[in-house]
From Swiss-Prot:
GO biological process, one term: response to hydroperoxide
Coiled coil: none
Lineage: Bacteria, Bacillati, Bacillota, Tissierellia, Tissierellales
GO cellular component, one term: cytosol
Source species of the chain: Finegoldia magna (strain ATCC 29328 / DSM 20472 / WAL 2508) (Peptostreptococcus magnus)
Family: Belongs to the UPF0246 family.
Domain of life: Bacteria
Protein name: UPF0246 protein FMG_1068
Length: 244
């Protein structure tokens, strides 16, 4: 079983006692870095539709990439989901569970294990650069071949790689019941979903979850597994009625 998650756009480069010196696909990562080093500030600004400041910072990141600080992937990404994984609370046994089961999808690195060393970067799968889905197609297909996959990634990173997989992943969704015009509807809220995706990863590590049935027992912040809203392709966890 493999759990897939998205990277974060923010970083705090931090070390872990045990780290992998090389990532899984070092040569292809280096090829992308070489291409990015040739980009001008104006080209980066156009590609990302970003401010001068972001383009200049990213330009410097790639120019200095080979000597930039490196840290453990699971501790160096600093988005909401990663903060709520709370990996610093996990002992070695639980971290080893994550190293075996958790995979981070990345535009630059392709697929990252938790202990892989990374540097700060900016490159998403949907950037107007090259088709990174096709660039990483063989690695994605081969790495996940035959695996049961739990999808805790954003749509950009998760569902867009489904066509390269031999087994359909199980998507995890978190929804709230809300009252709209007298009817109860299910609504997904971005920030609570990111928090819960992080907490679910922590839960899976603490409980050494190995299958879907075990995962259905997850309960957090009022969200519980909803059989009637779930099917073979997704597990839905619902928080009971909140008026809106």
């Amino acid at each position: 079983m493999k759990i897939i998650i998205s990277p974060a756009k923010t970083f705090k480069i931090r070390k872990l006692k045990k780290e992998n010196i090389d990532c899984l696909f070092e040569n292809k990562k280096n090829a992308l870095v070489s291409i990015m080093k040739e980009k001008s500030i104006e080209e980066l600004k156009s590609m990302w539709k970003c401010s001068d400041k972001i383009a200049e910072e990213s330009y410097k990141l790639y120019k200095n990439f080979d000597v930039s600080p490196k840290g453990c992937a699971i501790r160096s990404f600093d988005g909401i989901q990663y903060q709520y994984m709370d990996v610093d609370s996990l002992d070695e046994d639980k971290l080893e569970y994550l190293e075996e089961h958790l995979r981070i999808l990345s535009g630059l690195y392709g697929i990252l294990r938790p202990f892989d060393q990374i540097s700060k970067y900016r490159l998403d799968f949907e950037d107007k650069f090259i088709n990174l889905y096709e660039f990483w197609e063989d690695e994605i297909r081969n790495h996940f071949e035959g695996e049961e996959i739990i999808d805790l990634a954003s749509k950009e990173y998760g569902q867009n790689i489904y066509k390269y997989l031999d087994k359909a992943p199980v998507k995890i969704e978190f929804k709230e019941e809300v009252l709209i015009d007298g009817d109860i509807k299910l609504k997904t809220k971005a920030t609570p979903s990111k928090i819960l995706r992080g907490r679910m990863v922590n839960y899976m590590a603490r409980n050494h979850i190995e299958n879907i049935e075990q995962l259905k027992k997850f309960s957090c912040d009022g969200y519980n597994y909803s059989e009637k809203n779930s099917d073979k392709k997704k597990l839905v966890f619902v928080k009971s009625l909140v008026s809106e």
